[in-house]
Amino acid sequence: MSGPRIGILALQGDVREHARALTEAGARPVAVRHAVELAEVDGLVLPGGESTTIGRLLRVFELLEPLRAAVAAGLPVFGSCAGMILLARDVVGGRPDQPLIGGLDIVVRRNAFGRQVDSFEAHLEVVGVAGPPVHAVFIRAPWVEKAGDAVEVLARVAEAPVTVRQGPLLATAFHPELTGDARVHRLFVDSVRSSGSGR
């Protein structure tokens, strides 16, 4: 089977849904729960879930420091929802001891659109995604409050950035894995290929 080997952090979240979208986008998805598995991938997806819980699990599974090192070394990573939070340099509304991987020069606000009952769907024009607007599912979603000069905003809801890219890092505040549309995953897989990481 050809295509880059893309890991999915399999501690919490929509692992199967991401795997399905990655397969459709031409990648070979694999579950990542340990550092030895992380070392074998060309790129990584950080799925949604509860960001503080995922952060604690990263410590339990001894993945936090290997992930930070991999991101610093240029591993392409795509974070959706909680994954966006984990890739941020700082979080508004988070716990002061919340572990972050970092890498994206952004400050995000947790639950920016409200609680679970305030979850919603929208159609977004996403830079780099051809075709009709992307159907985006927002579930207790963050948004980007501040972004550094190196961060490219790819999509917004009202004025709030909800999709950003910085070098090999991509993040969405929404869950593209839930809609059956693999175009955002394809954007990431293509970036892995173009980075030279894809085997």
Curated annotation (Swiss-Prot):
InterPro entries: Class_I_gatase-like (IPR029062), PdxT/SNO (IPR002161), PdxT/SNO_CS (IPR021196). CDD domains: GATase1_PB (cd01749). It comes from the Bacteria. It catalyses: aldehydo-D-ribose 5-phosphate + D-glyceraldehyde 3-phosphate + L-glutamine = pyridoxal 5'-phosphate + L-glutamate + phosphate + 3 H2O + H(+); L-glutamine + H2O = L-glutamate + NH4(+). Its EC number is 4.3.3.6, 3.5.1.2. The active site is at C81, H175, E177. One of its GO terms (cellular component) is cytosol. Keywords: Glutamine amidotransferase, Hydrolase, Lyase, Pyridoxal phosphate. One of its GO terms (molecular function) is glutaminase activity. PROSITE patterns: PDXT_SNO_1, PDXT_SNO_2. Pathway: Cofactor biosynthesis; pyridoxal 5'-phosphate biosynthesis. Signal peptide: none annotated. Belongs to the glutaminase PdxT/SNO family. In the presence of PdxS, forms a dodecamer of heterodimers. Only shows activity in the heterodimer. PANTHER family: PYRIDOXAL 5'-PHOSPHATE SYNTHASE SUBUNIT SNO, PYRIDOXAL 5'-PHOSPHATE SYNTHASE SUBUNIT SNO1-RELATED. Catalyzes the hydrolysis of glutamine to glutamate and ammonia as part of the biosynthesis of pyridoxal 5'-phosphate. The resulting ammonia molecule is channeled to the active site of PdxS. This is Pyridoxal 5'-phosphate synthase subunit PdxT. It comes from Frankia casuarinae (strain DSM 45818 / CECT 9043 / HFP020203 / CcI3). The gene is pdxT.
